[in-house]
Amino acid sequence: QPQGRVAKAVLISAVPPLMVKTEQNPGGTPIEVFDGFRKALAANRAQFYLDVASGPFYGFNRDGAEISQGTIQNWWRQGMIGSAKAHYEGIKAFSETDQTEDLKSITLPVLVMQGDDDQVVPYKNAAILQDKLLPNSQLKIYPGFPHGMHTSHADTINADLLAFIRA
């Protein structure tokens, strides 16, 4: 049943319910990782965006990866366009905001998509939990796909998105 004007939703490599490790979320990522992101961002934002895109975001740090300089440069370009302050504060927002109750309240159909080689958002603490919390979800885990799978594997992701929307 649509909620207002929204009939369906999709989560792609999404962070909910909670990324940071807490007493209630023992499988989360230690706060020191996010502190490191903030430190790197504050020290040299341009290098931070090159390093993340060149490494874990698209899986370019994996043996045999086909590295796309265009993809790296485009991600860097997008990062540099945004506000440094917003990016810095965004790290807290995406890592420390508990969205458990929000997920439970979404009753419309939700497609949850994530790669099992996501080095940025571990799928077992994200997609698997999202699927359990969302009352009307469909889970798709993609073997070997990275966090940035919407770019690195666009044909597969787009086909599954369209199939979900049309169903």
Language-model features: locations:
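Flexible "cap/lid" loop of the alpha/beta hydrolase fold
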Residues: 1-43
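Conserved alpha/beta-hydrolase catalytic His-Asp/Glu region
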Residues: 20-29, 39-104
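Acidic beta-to-alpha connecting loop that harbors the catalytic carboxylate
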Residues: 116-119, 144-146
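Catalytic active-site module of serine/aspartate enzymes centered on a nucleophile-bearing elbow/loop
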Residues: 135-167
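Residue-level signal for the nucleotide or nucleotide-sugar donor/cofactor binding architecture
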Residues: 82, 121, 149-152
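Conserved alpha/beta-hydrolase "acid-adjacent" motif
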Residues: 119-125
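Short beta-strand/loop motif that positions the catalytic acidic residue
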Residues: 106, 112-114, 118
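Conserved hydrophobic packing residues within short motifs/helices of P-loop NTPase cores
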Residues: 10, 111-113, 140
